[in-house]
Structure formats: structure tokens, C-alpha cells
Amino acid sequence: MNRPPLPLAAHDRLIFALDVPGHDEAIAWVDRLGESVAFYKIGMELLASGEYFHVLDALAKRNKRVFVDLKFFDIPATVAGTIRRLSQWPVSYCTVHGWHAGMLEAAAAANQGDMRLLAVTVLTSMGRPDLAAMGIDREPVDVVVERALAAQAAGIDGVIASGQEAGMIRRATGPAFSIVCPGIRPGGPVGDDQQRTVGVAQAFADGADAIVVGRPIRLANDPAAAAAAIQAEIRAAVVQHRD
């Protein structure tokens, strides 16, 4: 059964990608950003430190929302067992790969908490040549929408997908499906390894529930001020979208 999108305040719609190697660096970033960020994504680099769940617990104790981005992909029983245990933690979002219907169904059935499962469709760093190298001679957007519909049918709560595809996903899946967009670039796309990017306002206009931002905050001279500026963009976009 699909869970509806999280009831997020505007301030909770900015997710900072906490791409750091360990606990101390993670907490230093949380302290540095203070009240400007209320939602954090923790991924594979932190997992390799052995301190992943210490960070998750520390974030929860600071009343921060947590997005576990580990892109689970295995046989259905293994993924189901992982989701069953992870759903007992204070986690808002969790990613699973969106390429195996049986695995998606098992993950959805195993989710026993309020956590929303997001299917990974096509990574934002990938373009058509990358898909062609995998034997898929199609445009990324076509694959993304197809995978989003398959995930929805399997009981998954939403997708993590490029803002370029958010509008098409929203039209295909309807309002009761979560869309989280990574690779967001304030002011519009720039040249880096995220190929399919959009700006903040465009992502929300096209139906995103939340956005993930990493480098534009992390590399800023004043990260907290950069996050606050993005929060202002989000508030304006959310108000405009509601109107």
C-alpha cells in the first residue's frame, strides 16, 4: 500500500546531502548549518566509516529528519528484512532500486513504520549513452516514468528523480506519490557530474515534494547563509505553487 507524501513544512523541504567520511565531520556540519537545515541525507560514504547509525541517532536527537540513501538492491527476502529493521528507526525517507518488481513489492510489504520508500529510477549523473551501454536504447525520461509507474504499482511511496522529469512523473502518478529531486542547483544548472539538473523554483513548480542539495551549500563561503537563501526560494516556490 502506498503511503501518502510526508506532510512537510516548507522548511523541511530542503534536504542537505551529508556526504562526509565520519561522525565528527557530520555533526560539525549539522552544528554549522544550525536551524537553516532540518533534513539530512546520509549515504554510502558515511556507511563505510562504521558510524552510520551513530550519526542517524545523533540527528534524531537533534530533531532533524533523516533520509537514508543506500539504494538497496538484492533478492526480495534480503531487502525485505533490511527494510523491516530500518523502519524501526526514526527515518523519513529510504531509497531502494526501482528495477525489480518482486523486490519492490517485498520492500513495501516489510515497511512497518512511517518511513517513505523512494525508488531509484535513473541516476541524475546518467544520460542516454549510459543507458545505451546497459542495453537500453531509450531516453532517460521515458525509462524514469516507466520505472516510477512500476514502483507505484508495487506499493512504493515515491521516487527520487531528476527535477527535469518531476513534471512528467507527477502527471503520470498523480498527487499522492512522493517525488524527491536531487542535484538541484540554485539559479539553474551548472556543469558538474549531475547531468539532469534544474533550479529550485522549477523543481517545485513541476511537482517535487522535497529537494536534495549538496555542493551549492557545502562549497559556499557561508554554508548557513547559502542554505537560508535556498529556504527563501523554497518558501516562495511553495506559496506560488499553492496559489
UniProtKB/Swiss-Prot annotation:
A GO cellular component annotation here is:
cytosol
- Report the PROSITE patterns cross-referenced here: OMPDECASE
EC number(s) given by UniProt: 4.1.1.23
User: Which is an annotated Pfam family here?
Assistant: OMPdecase
Q: Which residues bind substrate?
A: 19, 41, 69-78, 124, 185, 194, 214-215
Class of this enzyme = lyase
Output this protein's name: Orotidine 5'-phosphate decarboxylase
Output the lineage of the source organism: Bacteria, Pseudomonadati, Pseudomonadota, Gammaproteobacteria, Lysobacterales
